[in-house]
Amino acid sequence: RRLKRIFESRYSPVIHAWSYKTNYTSAVCNIMHQESSWAEVVSSFEYDKARALGVPGERIIFNGPNKSKAALERAVAEGAHIHVDHMDEIKLLESVAQSLGKIVEVTMRLNFDTGYTEPWCRFGFNIESGQAQHAAGAIAVSPHLKLTGLHSHIGTFITEPRAYEAQVRIMAKFMRTLEDSSDVRIDFFDIGGGFPSINSLKSIYLPPEQVVPDLTEYADLICGALSEETRYRK
């Protein structure tokens, strides 16, 4: 509740999605959904669980690099938000959309160097190499796909709030590049998670309150960067 309140008081609209891979105990997930959180899933198992718990497809974010054709068919049919990780998935999703006679809104997962954390390059499309630009082009020319969102996840237990500010600004720069060179219109950013907890003392030997920044420090920089970077959008 505090995290939600902190972000919503600084920027609007904000959507929180509960990561099922973090804890998919039904009772925990239900509490998060009662607090208006969406479901963020990375597998068919997690997707099925979210639906069984009553989460509608349009409130599910389907992440992960290994989605099957059957999983994508169900997600598309139920209106889930699909994040694509690699070119093969773009081709598979295009085939699914065509077979179902739908235009599917797509979010691209990006990876890049923020300058503050070790780059997570295993998943998503790299900006620096031009891979992300190429993937965006492939989506843009498809009559069955529509690029509407950008996603990145820069790590876990990140104790430097400026890493998130850099993340937002890099994503915004890439967004402007796409929008200035095509008909693409980005509607939202998914900035992942990774905020440190004072209850999870990973490699920390001092009292957590001396090491872990308050959530307000993260929200100030993230929301401030979002406001600045989107202020003059057409």
Predicted regions and their residues:
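C-terminal active-site-proximal or functional interface alpha/beta core segments in diverse enzymes
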Residues: 159-234
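Active-site-proximal beta-alpha core segment in soluble small-molecule metabolic enzymes
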Residues: 12-188
